[in-house]
Amino acid sequence: MVFAALDPLGVPLGTAQASFGTDGIRGRVGTLLTPAFILQVGYWCGQVLPDQGPVLIGMDSRSSGAMVASALTAGLTAAGREVWTLGLCPTPAVPGLIRKLGAAGGLMVSASHNPPEDNGIKVFGADGAKLSPAKQGLIEAGLRGEAIGDKGRPTITSCGPAYQRNELLSHYRDALLASVLHQRLDGVPIVLDLCWGAATACGAEVFAALGADLTVLHGEPDGRRINVGCGSTQLEPLRRAVIERGAIMGFAFDGDADRMLALDGHGRVVDGDHVLYLWGSDLQDRQALPQQRLVATVMSNLGFERAWQQRGGVLERTPVGDQHVYAAMVESNAALGGEQSGHILSAAHGLCGDGVLTALQLATLCHGRGLSLGEWLDQSFQAFPQKLVNVRVPDLERRMGWQHCEPLQEAVLAAEAAMGEDGRVLVRASGTEPLLRVMIEAADSAAVEFWTAQLADLAEQHLNRGCV
């Protein structure tokens, strides 16, 4: 029976303006993410997720994480769901444990690479994949106060139980080691930047278990310093440590450890495109890459695409967001895909972005070939000059509707015409931050600088002054 959503929790519904972005619901704690709103999110997740099995909740190290997880637990149990909280863990641990334990779904409390004052909620279904847009829409409808199948006001007899199950993280650690067949890294000098975040739960532990000679930066959970001047968005601390310690590789993670960027021994960046090329080449050499296909996003470098084509490979591009990469990989039966930013998805390892697993794969593949990461990088490709500028556009309507700004659209067309087949223009409104991202890529670095400045200036001038 379907009932109207008439305040089943005693909390006013329909007042929060929130929706799923490219990576869940995300925002400033105390502004969007209030206890009352988070409780509603938990409740409506409980209505939408399958009825059988527990719902798992993991979290990164943010100071607000306990509040968010507690409010989600209250909402889920009010919907009659059984909740197992995992404590501090990387995001990929949640979908991995969903599949292993037969859970109904899971939620990860994290704002990924965002600053400490933000937080977010990622929702996974019973298959371990992020919820489909249709199911996300049902949760959004519930938050607006619309009828989606509410079971009525919770009662003492209808509330579900909640259990703390931190010990389950050991299954994830075991899976990480099994992913590289327990290959050894004895004495290999490696630096890890754990970002004060979720990677501190197991990152150093698994590398140490393989015998690596480790240097660990930002290696304790710290909710006030997560992502601050460190991790995959701030590589300079890792670069200094790699060079000073004479390491042959270094890995930096973001706040929830679902992505990773690497540095070679000279401090050169190994981004997601390079990881896809190197790991994909290994799979191709072993005839383990169906259709010679890799899946990447529109952000991936043109130099990567052309080099992969020269190897006889196919590069399929998707919109930005690992959920789009996931969908394309499932549809085309691809073995490997990911984003330039460092989200890498492997069909053999659960099709979920996993920074620690990717770092282990890269380290063991290099070591197994008798190469340093720099030597292997030299065998990859020469990236086209590429520049990304973030233009702050707080107004959501103007940001999402940038295509209707005639001066900006005309400049985009002019840039594309000027660069021809040797360049690309990508303008994209962020789904998680108040930013318009302007990316220019071309064989000519001067063209990159010129058109990036032109488009960024036009976006700043017009979108923040009422062009749309």
Swiss-Prot record:
<protein>
    <recommendedName>
        <fullName>Phosphoglucosamine mutase</fullName>
        <ecNumber>5.4.2.10</ecNumber>
    </recommendedName>
</protein>
<dbReference type="GO" id="GO:0006048">
    <property type="term" value="P:UDP-N-acetylglucosamine biosynthetic process"/>
</dbReference>
<dbReference type="InterPro" id="IPR016055">
    <property type="entry name" value="A-D-PHexomutase_a/b/a-I/II/III"/>
</dbReference>
<dbReference type="GO" id="GO:0005975">
    <property type="term" value="P:carbohydrate metabolic process"/>
</dbReference>
<feature type="binding site" description="via phosphate group">
    <location>
        <position position="112"/>
    </location>
    <ligand>
        <name>Mg(2+)</name>
    </ligand>
</feature>
<dbReference type="Pfam" id="PF02880">
    <property type="entry name" value="PGM_PMM_III"/>
</dbReference>
<dbReference type="InterPro" id="IPR005845">
    <property type="entry name" value="A-D-PHexomutase_a/b/a-II"/>
</dbReference>
<dbReference type="InterPro" id="IPR005846">
    <property type="entry name" value="A-D-PHexomutase_a/b/a-III"/>
</dbReference>
<dbReference type="InterPro" id="IPR005843">
    <property type="entry name" value="A-D-PHexomutase_C"/>
</dbReference>
<keyword id="KW-0479">Metal-binding</keyword>
<dbReference type="GO" id="GO:0005829">
    <property type="term" value="C:cytosol"/>
</dbReference>
<dbReference type="InterPro" id="IPR036900">
    <property type="entry name" value="A-D-PHexomutase_C_sf"/>
</dbReference>
<feature type="binding site">
    <location>
        <position position="256"/>
    </location>
    <ligand>
        <name>Mg(2+)</name>
    </ligand>
</feature>
<dbReference type="InterPro" id="IPR050060">
    <property type="entry name" value="Phosphoglucosamine_mutase"/>
</dbReference>
<dbReference type="GO" id="GO:0000287">
    <property type="term" value="F:magnesium ion binding"/>
</dbReference>
<feature type="active site" description="Phosphoserine intermediate">
    <location>
        <position position="112"/>
    </location>
</feature>
<dbReference type="GO" id="GO:0004615">
    <property type="term" value="F:phosphomannomutase activity"/>
</dbReference>
<dbReference type="GO" id="GO:0008966">
    <property type="term" value="F:phosphoglucosamine mutase activity"/>
</dbReference>
<comment type="similarity">
    <text>Belongs to the phosphohexose mutase family.</text>
</comment>
<keyword id="KW-0460">Magnesium</keyword>
<dbReference type="InterPro" id="IPR006352">
    <property type="entry name" value="GlmM_bact"/>
</dbReference>
<dbReference type="InterPro" id="IPR005844">
    <property type="entry name" value="A-D-PHexomutase_a/b/a-I"/>
</dbReference>
<dbReference type="InterPro" id="IPR005841">
    <property type="entry name" value="Alpha-D-phosphohexomutase_SF"/>
</dbReference>
<dbReference type="Pfam" id="PF00408">
    <property type="entry name" value="PGM_PMM_IV"/>
</dbReference>
<dbReference type="GO" id="GO:0009252">
    <property type="term" value="P:peptidoglycan biosynthetic process"/>
</dbReference>
<dbReference type="Pfam" id="PF02879">
    <property type="entry name" value="PGM_PMM_II"/>
</dbReference>
<comment type="function">
    <text>Catalyzes the conversion of glucosamine-6-phosphate to glucosamine-1-phosphate.</text>
</comment>
<dbReference type="Pfam" id="PF02878">
    <property type="entry name" value="PGM_PMM_I"/>
</dbReference>
<feature type="binding site">
    <location>
        <position position="258"/>
    </location>
    <ligand>
        <name>Mg(2+)</name>
    </ligand>
</feature>
<feature type="binding site">
    <location>
        <position position="254"/>
    </location>
    <ligand>
        <name>Mg(2+)</name>
    </ligand>
</feature>
<keyword id="KW-0413">Isomerase</keyword>
<dbReference type="InterPro" id="IPR016066">
    <property type="entry name" value="A-D-PHexomutase_CS"/>
</dbReference>
<feature type="modified residue" description="Phosphoserine">
    <location>
        <position position="112"/>
    </location>
</feature>
<keyword id="KW-0597">Phosphoprotein</keyword>
